[in-house]
């Protein structure tokens, strides 16, 4: 782990309240990380006290080397100090950061046949970073991957077109969007109405073949963890990361 400055080089809105930000290290050094890890951005509250926020790295690489750009997705919290900082950051602006951290990663010694990747909101970001690894594992080990992603409506389906395109390109990967409030105007084959547990139940989790990853809203993570345990998966087969909004 090290500390460094990041310079914003590009950004765009992914959804009405979610911004995609692409940074490069100010010193020009490529950023080495394992897909699934996160960074911390350091700043100060208005009273001068130091604080930090964690963001999963969403950069799509080959899964084994350093990358030039470090990409994150920031969900804005009303009155949030980090939200204000990153909403006002212009291209060329810098922030202090450290990392990488975390173990929410695909494990080299896994021997399962299928991965169930479950997310809500910006919790889908680490799975985007894993796409290079996923492509490799579908051929090297014959693994299958099912990404179950919950959003309230199509406009909040982050990186949805990327995942749809990847599913068309990689036969061992399937994408299952779940819309809890408003379905798409033009539904697609894998779309489901309701929460992620609906699609997950249809996938019939199997302790003999599956390892599950859960990332996003804490309630979703807890409820899905319970569902998977009821299906027979052991605790080591369920890997979790909760996203908690902070001001």
Regions found by a protein language model. Give the residues of each.
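Acidic/glycine-rich phosphate/pyrophosphate-binding loops and surrounding catalytic core
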Residues: 89, 111, 128
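A phosphate-binding catalytic loop at a beta-strand-loop-alpha-helix junction
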Residues: 114-130
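Generic structural signal for buried aliphatic residues
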Residues: 39, 95-98
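Short, conserved phosphate/pyrophosphate- and ester-handling motifs at nucleotide-, phospho-/glycolipid
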Residues: 36, 123, 217
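Ferredoxin-reductase
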Residues: 2-91, 180
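Short helix-loop-beta connector
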Residues: 108-113, 206-209
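Reductase modules of NAD(P)H-dependent flavoproteins
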Residues: 2-5, 145-247
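Short, charged beta-turn/beta-strand-edge "cap" motif at the junction between a beta-strand
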Residues: 44-48, 99-104
């Amino acid at each position: 782990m090290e500390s460094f400055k990041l310079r914003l080089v590009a950004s765009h809105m992914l959804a009405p309240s979610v911004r995609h930000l692409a940074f490069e290290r100010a010193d020009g050094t490529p950023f080495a990380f394992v897909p699934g890890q996160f960074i911390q951005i350091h700043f100060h509250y208005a009273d001068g006290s130091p604080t930090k926020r964690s963001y999963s790295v969403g950069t799509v690489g080959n899964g084994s080397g350093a990358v030039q750009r470090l990409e994150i997705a920031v969900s804005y919290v009303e009155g949030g100090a980090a939200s204000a900082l990153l909403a006002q950051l212009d291209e060329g602006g810098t922030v202090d950061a450290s990392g990488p951290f975390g173990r929410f990663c695909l494990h080299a010694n896994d021997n399962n046949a299928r991965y169930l990747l479950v997310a809500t909101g910006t919790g889908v970001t680490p799975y985007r970073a894993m796409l290079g690894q996923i492509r490799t594992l579908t051929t090297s080990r014959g693994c299958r991957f099912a990404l179950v992603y919950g959003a309230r409506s199509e406009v909040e389906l982050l990186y949805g077109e990327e995942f749809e395109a990847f599913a068309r390109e990689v036969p061992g990967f399937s994408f299952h969007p779940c819309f809890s409030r408003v379905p798409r105007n033009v539904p697609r084959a894998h779309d489901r109405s309701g929460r992620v547990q609906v699609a997950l139940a249809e996938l019939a989790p199997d302790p003999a073949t599956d390892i599950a990853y859960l990332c996003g809203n804490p309630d979703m993570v807890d409820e899905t963890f319970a569902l998977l345990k009821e299906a027979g998966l052991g605790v080591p087969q369920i890997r979790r990361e909760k996203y908690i909004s902070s001001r």
